[in-house]
Amino acid sequence: MGDGLDAVQMSGSSSSQGQPSSQAPSSFNPNPPETSNPTRPKRQTNQLQYLLKVVLKSLWKHQFAWPFHAPVDAVKLNLPDYYKIIKNPMDMGTIKKRLESAFYTSAQECIQDFNTMFTNCYIYNKPGDDIVLMAEALEKVFLTKISEMPQQEVEISTTAGKGRGRGRRDPDMNMKVGPVLEPLTASPQTRGLSNLTPGPQTRGPPQGPPTLPPQPIVQIQALPPRVPPSLPTIPLHAPQLGPPFSLGPTDCNPPAPIITAVPPPTQTALPPVHIQQSAAPPILQTPISIPNKRKSQKRKADTTTPTANDQLNESSPAESKSGKTLPRRDNTRPSKLPKKEAPDSQHHWTAAPGTPSPKQQEQLRYCSGIVKDMFAKKHAAYAWPFYKPVDVDTLGLHDYHDIIKHPMDLSTIKDKLETRQYREAQEFAADVRLMFSNCYKYNPPDHEVVAMARKLQDVFEMRFAKMPDEPEEMLAPAPAPVLHPAPVKTQPVMATASSSDTSSDSSSESESSTDDSEEERAQRLAELQEQLKAVHEQLAALSQPQASKPKKKEKEKKEKKKDKHKKKAGVMPALEEILEPPPALKPQGKPKNKDPLPKKSKKLSKKEGGKSNRSMAPPGAAPPTLQPVPGLDTEEDLGLTGGAAMAGMAAGEKCKPMSYEEKRQLSLDINKLPGDKLGRVVHIIQSREPSLKNSNPDEIEIDFETLKPSTLRELERYVSSCLRKKKKPAVPEKSMEAISAVKTKGTSSDSGSSSESSSSESEDSETGMASKPKKRGRGEGKKAHHQTTAPGMPLPQVPLQPQTPALQPSIQLKQQQPQHPSPAAYMPPPVTALEPSQLLENPFDPLAHFMHLPHHANDSSSPAPPHLNAHPPGGPVSPETHPFLNQHPILPSPALHNALPQQPSRPSNRAAPLPPKPLQQSTSQQQPPPQQTLVPPQQLQPQQQQPAPPQQQHLPHHPLHAPQQMRPRPLSPPTLTPQGLLSSQPPQMLLEDDEEPVPSMSLPMYLQHLQPNRLQATPTSLMQSLQSRPQPPGQPSLLQSVQVQSHLPPPQLPVQTQVQPQQPAPHQPSPQLSQHQARHMQQLGFPQGPLQTAQTQPGQHKVSMPSTKAQQIIQQQQATQHHSPRQHKADSYNSAHLRDNPSPLMMHSPQIPQYSLVHQSPSQDKKEPQRGPSALGGIKEEKLPPSPVMRGEPFSPAMRPESHKHPDSKPTMPGHSQQRADMKPLEMSRPVIRSSEQSGPPPSMQDKEKFKQEPKTPSAPKKVQDVKFKNMGSWASLAQKSSTTPSSGLKSSSDSFEQFRRAAREKEEREKALKAQVEQAEKDRLRKEQEKLRGRDEEDSIEPPRRPLEEPRRRQEPQQVQPPPQQHQTQAQAQTLNPAQSPSASQPTQAPPQSPASSQSALDQQREMARRREQERRRREAMAATIDMNFQSDLMAIFEENLF
C-alpha cells in the first residue's frame, strides 16, 4: 500500500485535494500526479504493503470514497479555481497507482499523500459540506488503519543477499520473506528508493492527522535503498500492526547503529527460526545496518552499518528513532532466539549487554507483555501517538528536541526490551514513564495527547503493578513456545515472560506475516492441524481412562474447592485437574520438548498463538488451539510464566506432552463445550498456570504452547469427560451437545438438555456439598462407578442404553447426587444403592440411605427395575401392573429415550438409587428404581432429566410446567412407577406425575417445610430441613421426594405454591403426619411419589387444612374445577390406561403433557386433597377402589402400596404397610371426611370413583398404581382433560410392544375416560356443592389461618385455573371435594372433627371459593394475554387426545 506522492509531491501537496472537484481551473485539468518514476529505485516495505493491501483497500471500498477515486475533474465539476487553490492535488487513484508501482520509498510518503488528499478537501470545501464530512469519515478510517500498521518499516525486496547475517537469513527470507519479496519485487511496489530513502525518512510532515506518528518509524525503516538487500522482509502482518508498532519507534533510536555489528553467525542461525517465528528476525538484523534500515541488519548486512545515511535520516526526525530502531531489531532477534529456539539465539549476541537473572528475565518478559498490550488494538485509540518516536519534521515540532532531551516511545522501548538493553524491569518502567513525562512536559495539560497519555499510563501502571515478584521459570526454555502464540494480542501480563521474545516475534511475525504468512502459514497450519489431530486422538484415548486415575481423589479435593468457586465449570475438569495437580503448576512452556518439531512447531504454534488471533484463527490447526480461550495468547501467558515455563516443562513433561494435533483437537473440543463448562476450563488453567492465576476469568488469553502438559492433559480429561457425557446421552436422547447447548443457554425445555445442563450445573451449582459427590459421581462414577457404582451407573446405563446411558448416568449422577445420594446408583440398584448413599452421603446422606432402601424395599419393585423388561416384580404384580410400577421405568425408558421431555424416570432414578434405605421408602422408591433399573435407557433420560431438575431452574420459561417437570422428574420416579405413569405420564400423566405428584407430595411437603423459607430454600436446605424433620423412617422417602424436588422445587413452587401456599404453615405444624403420609405414599410407591405426593399433599393439606383448610379447599377446588373433570376421569381411566400402557402416553407426549401436567398437577394435587377431604371415600374409591380395580392385576406391593390405598398398600410390603399405617391416619381422615363428604357428595364421589374405576378397571391388573392412581388422579385428570391425551400420549411414547398393548387399553380408557369425564363433571358438581357447604363450615373454622395462605394460592391458582375452562370446572368440582378433603388431609386424625368443621365452614368455604373463583376469573382475564403453561398443557393434552 503506497505512501502517496513522492517526497517532493508530499512536501508540495499539503492540501492538494479537497473533493473530487474539477482539477482544471476552467478549460483543462492539470496532468495527474506522477505515479511512477523510473529514476527512483523501486522499494517495497511491509508498511507500504500494508497501506496498499489494508489501508487503501478498505478506504477504496468505503461508501464515501467514490469522490476520491480519481483526480478532481475541475472541468466536469465546473471548479475553475480548484487547481488555483489546490497546488498539490491528490486522490486515492493516484495513491493506488503509486503503491502498485512501488513509487513510494517509504510508507511516510504514502501517508503524506493521503493527508494531502484530505487536507485539499478541507481547504477547498466548506467545513459543513458533504464532501468534507465524507473526507472526515474516510480520514477516520484511514487513521484507524494506520494506527494498526506495523510500527517498523521493513523493506521487502528481492535483493536479499546483503549482509553476512543475511547469508543465513537469505534462506529465511526466501522461505518467509522470499516469496513475498519476489512478488513485491516483481511488482513495481518493490522498488525502494535508496536515494530517496533519506528524504522519506525525513518524514515529510504528514499533513493528515497526527496519527501518523508511526510514520516516522516507517520512514526510518523506509531507507530501503541500502537496506533493500537487508531482510526488512516482512513486518508483522499489517493486522499485527499494533504490536509490531513498538518495533518501529525503537528502531529510530540512535544506539541501534552502534549495535549494528551483528555477528553474522547469530543472524545466520537466526533466519530459519526467524522465518517460522516471524519476519521480525530481519528487523532484528536491521540494527546491524544501524540506521540503515534494520532490514539490512536483519539481512545480516555488514555488522558495520552500510546504511549509515539511513541512520542519519532517521536520526534527524528523531534521534531515538533511527538509533533505537536498529539495535532493537538486532537485539530483538537474539532475545527471541534464546527464548524460543536456538536459531533465534543467533541474535543473542545483542542480548549480551545484560544478562538479567531469571527473576529479572521473567519480569522483563512481563514488561514485554505490557508493551504488547499497549500496542493492542484495544488501546490503539489512545496509544497510537506513542507507538513511534515523535516525528519532529512531519509534525513540525522543531522545538521538540530542545524541550525534550530524552525522547522515548513505545517502539523504542519495545526494541530495547527485545535487544535486552534493560537489565531489570525498573529500567523499563523508567523509560515508559519518561515517555509519558515527555508528553506531559511538551504538551499543554488540556491537549488531547495528554489525555491519551494518561489513559495509556493508567493501563501501564495497572499492568506493571501486577508484575510477578518471583520468576516462575527460566524464560529461555518455555518462552520460545509461549512467544509464538503470544503475538500482538497476547495479554501483556501473560506475555511478560516471553515479552521480549514475544514482542520481537510479534513484530517479526507482523513483518513477515505478509510475506511468508501466506505460504508458511498454510504449511504451519497443515502441520498444526495434523498435530492437533494427533493431540485430539490422544486426548480421546486419554480422556476415557483418565477418569480412573488414582490422583482423582486429590483432584476431587482441589476440584471441590474449585467447584465452589466455579460451579458451572463442570465436574470433569476438576477431576482432570485432580489427576495432574502438580503438573498444572508447571507451564506447558515446552511444547517444543513435547513435539518432535519443537522449534518449528513451536514457531508455528507461536505464530498460531500469536497469529491465530490475527491470522491463525482461520487456519484449522492453530485457531482451534486458540479458540478454546478466545483471547488466549499464551505467548504472553508464558511471558508471565517465562521462568515457570521451564520448570513447567520439567514437571509438565512428567505428563505426556501433547502433540500439536492433540492441542488442536483440544482447542476444537473446548470450543464445543457449552458456556457453563468454560468456567471450569478457565479454572483448570488458572489453577495450574501460576502466570494466569491473576488473569481475568471472564476473558483469558492463553497459548496452548505455554500451558504445562499437566494442564493440557487435565483440560483434555475434562473436555473429553464433558463431551463424552454430552455425546452419550445425545445418542439416545436428542444430543448431549444440543442439550449442552441448551444448557449453556440456560434453557432446559428439553429434558435431554436439562439433563445435560443439570449434569454439569447441578454438579457444580446445585450444592457445594453436592459438588463433591458430583465430582465423585463423575470421577468415581466414570472410573470406579463407571462400572456399576452409583457414579458408575452411567456406565451401567450405557449397557442398558448403550449410547446415552454412560453420559446421561454420569449427568444423572451429578444431579442425583446433589438431589439424592442414591440417584447415582440408579443403574445397578444394589450397587448403586450403596454408591448413592456414599456419593450422597456428603450432600444427602439420609436420602441416600432412604433412596437405597427403595431398591431393597422394592424387592418386588426393585428387582423389577433391573429387570424392568423382564418384569421380575411382575410376580407380585401382574405383568401390566408390574411394567407400570416397575416397568414404568422400562416403558418410559424407551419413551424417555425417544423423547427427552418425558424423563420422569429421572425422579424415579433419584428415588431408586437409594434402595438400601427402609422398605417403606423402598416401596415408594421401588417404582422409581424399576424405572431406574428397569430401564437404564430410561434412566439415562431420567438421569438426564435429573439434570433436568437443575434445568427446572433453567426452565423458568415454563414456570409451572418446567419446574414441575423438573421436579416431577425427580419425584416422577415414584409417581411414574406407582401408576406406570412413567410410561403413561409423558402426555399428561407423566407430566402430572412428574409435576403434580412431585409438587403434591414432595413439593407440598417441601413447601410446607420450605414455605417458611418459601421457594427460597435451596434444594440442599430443603433436603436438610426435611432431613432434620424426618420423624419416622418412612419420612426419608418423603424427604427424598422433597429432596428430589429440592432441585426441582423452585420451578415447581409456583404450581404447588398455589396449592400449598396455605398448606406450608399447617403442614409444618404436622410435618410428621404429612411427611409420614407422603413418606408412606412414597414407600408404597415412591415412584408413585408424584401421585402419592398428590395424595400425600392432600393428606398434608388436610393436616394443614385446619389452619389453611379453607384456602386450600378453595384453591384445590378451583384447581379441581380446572383439572377435576379431566383429572378425575384421567385418574380413572388413566390409571388403568397408564398402568397398562403408561409409558406410551407418557413417553409419547412427555414434552407437551409436561406442561399440561405441570399446570394440572397443582390442580390435581388440589383435587386429590379435595377428593380426599370432601370425598375421601370417593377419592379412595376413585383412587383406591379404582386403583385396585385398575390395578385389578395383582399390584406389586412396592407399586401398589399407597397410604391412600391401604388395602393395596397392605398387600404391597411391610414398608408399604407402614405407609398404610401412616397413611391410614390420612385415609382415616379421608374416610371420615369421605363419610362427611359422602353424606352430600359421596354418590358423586363414588360415581366418579366408579367412573375412574371403570376406566381403570380395564387396567385392574395395575394394582400397583394405587399410589399411582392417586397421582393418577391428577395425572388422570390431565388425561381426562385430554381424555384421549393420556392414552394417546402414552401410546406415542410407549415401547413398541407396550404401545400396542397400551393402544388398545387406551382406546378403552379413552371411551371410559370420556364417560368418566361426563360423570365426573356431574359428580364434581355434586361434590363441589357438598364441599362448598362443608367448605363453608370448614372455612369458618379454618378461614383465618387459611386466608393468608389463600392469597398466594389464589394468585398461583389463577395461573393454574386460567388455562383450561375444563380445569376450572374440574377445580370447581374438586373444590367441593377439596373443602372436605382439605380438612381431612389437614388432619388425618382430625378428619372426623374436620368433617363437621368442613360442614361448618362449608358456607365460608363456598363463599371463599366464590371469591377465589371470581378473583381467579379476573386474574385469568388479566393474565389472558400471558402464556399460561397450564392452559398450554391442556391444549397439548387435548391435541394428544385427538391424535389417538
Swiss-Prot record:
Comp. bias (Polar residues): 186-196, 303-319, 1090-1109, 1151-1163
A Pfam family that the UniProt record links to this protein: Bromodomain
Marked site: Acetylated histone binding: 125, 443
Positions of the UniProt region annotated as Disordered: 1-44, 154-217, 279-362, 492-523, 540-645, 722-986, 1020-1422
GO CC terms, sorted: chromatin; condensed chromosome; nucleus
GO MF annotation: an example: p53 binding
Location of the Bromo domain: 43-149, 358-467
Disulfide partners: none
Keyword Nucleus: yes
Biased amino acid composition, Pro residues: 206-216
InterPro entries attached to this UniProt entry: BRD4_CDT (IPR031354), Bromo_Brdt_I (IPR043508), Bromo_Brdt_II (IPR043509), Bromo_chromatin_reader (IPR050935), Bromodomain (IPR001487), Bromodomain-like_sf (IPR036427), Bromodomain_CS (IPR018359), NET_dom (IPR027353)
Tissue expression per record: Widely expressed.
Cited PANTHER family: BROMODOMAIN-CONTAINING PROTEIN 4 (PTHR22880:SF245), FALZ-RELATED BROMODOMAIN-CONTAINING PROTEINS (PTHR22880)
Function: Chromatin reader protein that recognizes and binds acetylated histones and plays a key role in transmission of epigenetic memory across cell divisions and transcription regulation. Remains associated with acetylated chromatin throughout the entire cell cycle and provides epigenetic memory for postmitotic G1 gene transcription by preserving acetylated chromatin status and maintaining high-order chromatin structure. During interphase, plays a key role in regulating the transcription of signal-inducible genes by associating with the P-TEFb complex and recruiting it to promoters.
Protein name in the entry: Bromodomain-containing protein 4
Gene: brd4
